Amino acid sequence: MKNCYIRISAFFVHLENFRREEKEAVMAKTYDFSELAQALVDKTVTKEELLNRVKSDFGLIPLLLTGVGSSKAAVRYGCSKLLIDLSEEYPEKLYPHFGSFIDLLDSKYRIVTWNALAIIANLTRVDADKRFDAIFGKYFSFLNSDYMVTVANVVGYSGTIALAKPYLIPRITDELLKVEDVSITQHLTEECKRVIAQQTIKTLGLFFDRIDQKERVLSFVRACLDSPRTKLRTTAEAFLEKWG
């Protein structure tokens, strides 16, 4: 019985070693797009493993960009999420592909657009050529979206952009204060507007000390003190306690 147990244990150890070696072999190989896509669909490689693979070979970034255009959701969103992670840690590696991320803003998939908004904001930290400045209007045009998540994403990422490009703070502030005039739609209710206002106050708080239009901002925040949304009221109160 003891020998049987030892043999079974040895089998599972061997099986685990085989699986580990198989994964290592997958990660060590040079992908083409079809192999990358299939690996994500079949889950023979995790997103974390693939991320580490790309970190060791940034030449794989074009494959991820191709993957974002895939008709398969697992590939599309898997590659898109990896690009966000890379933009946070290695914006300089993605910066040469800035134009590709601008194109993704017009994706028919909202999640891809949201991810592109995040990536572009992260790339402003290394935007020596002021490529973002050229698309400022396009980026902030998404504040006019019919969808709350799209508007909220622009508001949230505006803080990253403002800190990376402080000379744009006056323009960014002007854009953020326009959320008061966001239109109600099927996908953006009055309560959604309150959520957006709450996020706007948080974002403005990241760089309020650098804002010239302080009284306009304070007026916007004070108007939120009577909101029926508790979290918005408390956010406004905390802002005014610090800055008002």
Residue ranges of each PLM-predicted region?
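Amphipathic alpha-helical scaffolding segments comprising HEAT/armadillo-like alpha-solenoid repeats
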Residues: 28-34, 55-68, 91-104, 129-142, ...
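N-terminal alpha-helical scaffold/docking segments in eukaryotic complex subunits
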Residues: 27-78, 85-86, 204, 230-244
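Conserved hydrophobic register position within alpha-solenoid helical repeats
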Residues: 50, 79, 116, 154, ...
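Non-membrane alpha-helical segments in proteins
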Residues: 76-86, 114-122
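Short inter-helical turns and helix N-cap capping residues of alpha-solenoid HEAT/ARM repeat scaffolds
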Residues: 71-73, 108-110, 146-147, 193, ...
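Extended alpha-helical scaffolding segments
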Residues: 161, 179-235
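Structural signature of alpha-helical solenoid repeat scaffolds
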Residues: 84-85, 121, 159-160, 198-201, ...
